[in-house]
Every structure is written in structure tokens, then in C-alpha cells.
């Protein structure tokens, strides 16, 4: 099985390059299942009903997220009833939405997706290590293919999660920083790992934001509402190849694809 993960889609430029390249990658690389992180898809902050539907139309089977999933309050009713859009699993159970799901790939294989959020430098949540392992074990009872999007700030926390779940899940791929790391590998237990998949948006930016606005914030320390950068966009992410019989990853490849 071939699984495509698309890193944090940032605002309209990210949606534009996702619309153009996801179908192309699915076709050319014979992808069976697509996961995208959509928490920044609405202007950089959150998600809307309409944008979620668009991401699905581009080919996304499941949409994962992180702390920005709560930014658009009007999206909460959609999130509460959707089984294709995830919020981090380790939020309290009373929070709208679900944090894991088992879906069917194009080749008929069942794939579980688990969304977790870190705690270092992030909003307070339940422990992702305890909650994540327990849920991964539950999901493994339904399918050996379990993909984890770990939305976290700290590199060390992400690396620790990779080893914590090694051999139990198919892949642990980090999101949130919008800067792709170059440490993709298969861990000793057969789990594919990448500290951060990066960002799908404008490369010539400060993690998706117009550079002059980010600089103004750093120079003055005055809070300001950021605006998304404009220009040529890049799709970042990862392609994971899996032995569907046991859920172990056989290969992971980083992706950086520029729009035409």
C-alpha cells in the first residue's frame, strides 16, 4: 500500500497547489490513501465546511489537524459530526469531533489514522504518550496499518513519540512547525518516521506568513493579525510504502513539489 501525507496546507496558495498536485501525485505514484493536515487551510487559521469539502475533492481521504482546528468557531458543528476530519485525540472527550478513525483505502485495505498533539510549548492537553499508545493498541485490533500525525512544537518530543510507538504503528509523521526536516527513516521496529513534514504553501515566507509582517512582530513585540504570503507555492509531505500484511513501513520518501 502507498500512502501520501500532505503537510499543513496554508491558506489559498496551499489549497491551490494541493488542488493541482494531489491528483497528479495520486495518479503518477499510484497512491492508495491520502491524508492531509488542514488546520491552516482557511487563511492560515483553522478550517471551514466548504474548504474541508474542497480538500476531500482534491483527493484527501482524511483531514488531520492540530491546535488551530478551533480557530473558526463556525466549523465546530461540521467537526462534531464528521468522520473524515480529525482533531487531536488527546483533547478532552467533551471537545467536538474525533481524534482517530479507520477508513478504507482505494485498494480495499483498512487504514487507521490517529491525530495527536504535543504538550511542549503547546496548549494544555492530556498526555499524548499515554493516550496515543492506548488508542494505537485499540486501532491495531482493527487493522495493522496505523498512521500517526503528531502535531507538536518540540523536535525531542516528536522523536520520543517515534520511539514510543515504534513497532506498534505504521508511521509517525510530525506537523506544526511548517519547516520540513531531513531525518526520514524506518525505525528499528518497522515504523516510518519524519520529525516534520513541512508546509504546503508559499516557500518564500515566514512559515506561511508575509515576511514583512512577521518581522514587524519581532521588531516591535506588538501583536498583529498575520496575513498569508502570496506567490509560488510548494507541496510538502511524505510518501510511505507499507506491507499491508503486517502494517510495517518498507520505505518513506520526503516530498517537496513546486507548482508549475
Please describe what each predicted stretch is.
Residues 1-260:
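Acidic, metal/ion-coordinating pockets
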Amino acid at each position: 500500500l502507498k500512502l501520501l501525507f500532505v503537510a499543513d496546507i496554508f491558506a489559498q496558495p496551499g489549497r491551490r497547489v494541493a488542488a493541482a498536485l494531489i491528483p497528479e501525485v495520486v495518479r503518477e505514484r499510484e497512491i492508495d490513501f491520502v491524508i492531509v493536515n488542514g488546520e491552516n487551510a482557511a487563511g492560515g487559521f483553522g478550517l471551514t465546511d466548504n474548504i474541508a469539502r474542497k480538500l476531500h475533492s482534491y483527493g484527501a481521504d482524511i483531514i488531520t489537524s492540530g491546535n488551530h482546528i478551533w480557530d473558526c468557531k463556525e466549523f465546530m458543528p461540521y467537526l462534531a459530526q464528521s468522520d473524515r476530519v480529525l482533531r487531536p485525540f488527546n483533547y478532552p472527550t467533551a471537545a467536538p469531533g474525533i481524534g482517530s478513525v479507520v477508513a478504507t483505502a482505494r485498494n480495499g485495505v483498512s487504514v487507521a489514522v490517529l491525530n495527536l498533539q504535543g504538550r511542549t510549548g503547546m496548549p494544555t492537553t492530556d498526555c499524548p504518550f499515554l493516550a496515543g499508545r492506548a488508542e494505537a493498541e485499540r486501532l491495531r485490533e482493527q487493522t495493522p496499518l496505523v498512521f500517526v500525525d503528531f502535531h507538536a512544537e518540540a523536535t525531542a518530543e516528536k522523536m520520543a513519540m517515534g520511539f514510543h510507538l515504534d513497532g506498534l504503528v505504521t508511521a509517525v509523521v510530525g506537523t506544526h512547525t511548517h519547516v520540513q526536516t531531513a531525518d526520514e527513516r524506518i525505525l528499528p521496529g518497522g515504523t516510518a518516521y519524519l520529525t516534520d513534514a513541512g508546509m504546503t504553501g508559499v516557500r518564500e515566507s515566514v512559515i506561511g506568513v508575509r515576511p514583512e509582517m512577521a518581522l514587524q512582530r519581532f521588531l516591535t513585540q506588538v501583536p498583529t493579525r498575520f496575513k498569508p504570503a502570496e506567490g509560488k507555492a510548494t507541496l510538502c509531505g511524505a510518501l510511505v510504502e507499507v506491507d499491508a500484511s503486517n502494517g510495517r513501513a518498507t520505505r518513506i520518501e520526503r516530498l517537496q513539489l513546486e507548482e508549475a
